[in-house]
């Protein structure tokens, strides 16, 4: 399932987001709520579904590409390929299921392994189903402490009420954008340094 691409989108900045987490935590529900303002409770798990949407990020029109990966163990072997293509990750668990929170550590390790050559990977930890407070198994402080340990932001969401749904996608896009700008600056700096060195060498030869 994918959102239709419109003409002229190719020239816009594109930010690639990967949804990661155990099965049944609400990754698809969050994605569909963000894409279409719809709450879908029952969703058939697939290997991966890709979505693309044009949004305005801090006054700039950009595209977000969302890959919603299946959390089931059956798909663990192909997850590496999806992770390689991602620029930022929403690491999702359900606050009503402590096991899904514990699993985030393994998913994070997999991301770090696949993206080992990169310095800081844009990543947010997302505690979904905040509307089910009475069934909470993961204390806010426990989740926040883990996120702080990893040096990332922790946000609680509800795909049902749409609480913080836009926030997590937009905050992650900002992190991706910052990383890209930093990398471009580094590349330009190295290029400039190389050109200066080349110029000096030519001067010496004259």
Curated annotation (Swiss-Prot):
User: Motif Effector region, which positions?
Assistant: 43-51
Q: Which positions are listed as propeptide?
A: 204-206
Q: Which SUPFAM superfamilies match?
A: P-loop containing nucleoside triphosphate hydrolases
Q: Which residues form a coiled coil?
A: none
| PTM comment, free text | Prenylation is essential for membrane localization. The geranylgeranylated form and the farnesylated mutant does not undergo alternative prenylation in response to geranylgeranyltransferase I inhibitors (GGTIs) and farnesyltransferase I inhibitors (FTIs). The farnesylated form confers resistance to the proapoptotic and anti-anchorage-dependent growth effects of geranylgeranyltransferase I inhibitors, including GGTI-2417.
Task: Spell out which residues are annotated as carrying Cysteine methyl ester.
Answer: 203
Taxonomic superkingdom: Eukaryota
* Covalent lipid adducts (S-geranylgeranyl cysteine), residues: 203
Membrane topology term reads: Lipid-anchor
Entry annotated with the keyword Cell wall biogenesis/degradation: no
Entries under Pfam families matching the protein: Ras (PF00071)
Control of this protein's activity = Alternates between an inactive form bound to GDP and an active form bound to GTP. Activated by a guanine nucleotide-exchange factor (GEF) and inactivated by a GTPase-activating protein (GAP).
Q: Name one GO cellular component term.
A: plasma membrane
GO terms classed as biological process: apoptotic process; cell division; cellular response to exogenous dsRNA; cellular response to starvation; negative regulation of protein binding; positive regulation of autophagosome assembly; positive regulation of epidermal growth factor receptor signaling pathway; positive regulation of protein binding
Q: Where is this region: Disordered?
A: 180-206
Q: Which UniProt keywords apply?
A: Apoptosis, Cell cycle, Cell division, Cell membrane, GTP-binding, Hydrolase, Lipoprotein, Membrane, Methylation, Nucleotide-binding, Prenylation
Give compartment(s): Cell membrane; Midbody
Reaction(s) catalysed by this chain, per the record, are: GTP + H2O = GDP + phosphate + H(+)
- Relate the outcome reported for changing residue 72 to L: Loss of GTPase activity
Result, substituting residue 206 to S: Converts geranyl-geranylation to farnesylation. No effect on membrane localization. Confers resistance to GGTI-induced pancreatic cancer cell apoptosis, but not to GGTI-dependent inhibition of anchorage-independent proliferation
Indicate the family of this protein.
Belongs to the small GTPase superfamily. Ras family.
Q: What biological function has been recorded for the protein in this entry? A: Multifunctional GTPase involved in a variety of cellular processes including gene expression, cell migration, cell proliferation, oncogenic transformation and membrane trafficking. Accomplishes its multiple functions by interacting with distinct downstream effectors. Acts as a GTP sensor for GTP-dependent exocytosis of dense core vesicles. Required both to stabilize the assembly of the exocyst complex and to localize functional exocyst complexes to the leading edge of migrating cells. Required for suppression of apoptosis.
The record describes its quaternary structure and partners as: Interacts with EXOC2/Sec5 and EXOC8/Exo84. Interacts (via effector domain) with RALBP1.
Stated name of the protein = Ras-related protein Ral-B
Which species expresses this protein natively? Answer: Homo sapiens (Human)
């Amino acid at each position: 399932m994918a959102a239709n691409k419109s003409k002229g989108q190719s020239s816009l900045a594109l930010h690639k987001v990967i949804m990661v987490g155990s099965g049944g935590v609400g990754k698809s529900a969050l994605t569909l709520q963000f894409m279409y303002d719809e709450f879908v409770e029952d969703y058939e798990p697939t290997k991966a579904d890709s979505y693309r949407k044009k949004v305005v990020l801090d006054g700039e029109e950009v595209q977000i590409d969302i890959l919603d990966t299946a959390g089931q163990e059956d798909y663990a072997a192909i997850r590496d390929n999806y992770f390689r293509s991602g620029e930022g990750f929403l690491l999702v668990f359900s606050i009503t299921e402590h096991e899904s929170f514990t699993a985030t550590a393994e998913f994070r390790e997999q991301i770090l392994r696949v993206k080992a050559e990169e310095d800081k990977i844009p990543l947010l930890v997302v505690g979904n189903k905040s509307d089910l407070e009475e069934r909470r198994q993961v204390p806010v402080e426990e989740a926040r402490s883990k996120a702080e340990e990893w040096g990332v932001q922790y946000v609680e969401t509800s795909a049902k009420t749409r609480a913080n749904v836009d926030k997590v996608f937009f905050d992650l896009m900002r992190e991706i954008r910052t990383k890209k700008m930093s990398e471009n600056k580094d590349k330009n700096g190295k290029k400039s340094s190389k050109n200066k060195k080349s110029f000096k060498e030519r001067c010496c030869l004259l």
